[in-house]
């Protein structure tokens, strides 16, 4: 983690050419995605992105029909895709699998133009043959597969919950932004959370210090209580959440955001209750 933090600092302060992408994956989400994101990986790779919307439209229609049939689950298509993917051979390149076995933390760094040589020079000097870090230069196909694997990580947690719904209570998904100079990005959870946790999954946009954190909890866990503990921890750390999505009706809006919403909608007509604000007309809290 310390070397990756130094890498981020050096790229942002010293590089002339910034990365196109810098995607982080922890080993746990890598492994989960290898199994539970395989059908997503194969679908995108072999159907192509142009055909994916049509594929999901058909899948949605099938799920809609299944909801109307007694004793059949609307998750049947997803389950079928999951088990069908097991019939296919290993889909990830050998070198990437070896890298995952060797290291706990992974960064997919995509450079272009003169930035390629700049990154190679830096990595060769600071990362090559180091006992606590290393790198590989991906071939074109390997690079595409690595990024596609990162894409599939977004659905892997949900697929895990569906397959193991008898053991899983639910998933708490957080997207958080750490302070830009915060190098303490590896999370240490309290025992109160750990004893209820099946798996914690971490991935994100490393140069932005933005992380997606999915917590899969054991059956009968009070997820709202776990969420409250997690959010208090993030508040103490100075993190912001949600980082990439609006607060909606799930999170309390900060004071500046509340002021903005009140200015934008002074009569509280268009989305009353957003950011856990009151739902009264004109925000007065005294009349409907």
What spans do the regions from the language model cover?
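Short, intrinsically disordered, mixed-charge
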Residues: 9-17, 232-236
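Accessory "access/gating" subregions that flank catalytic or transport cores
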Residues: 79-82
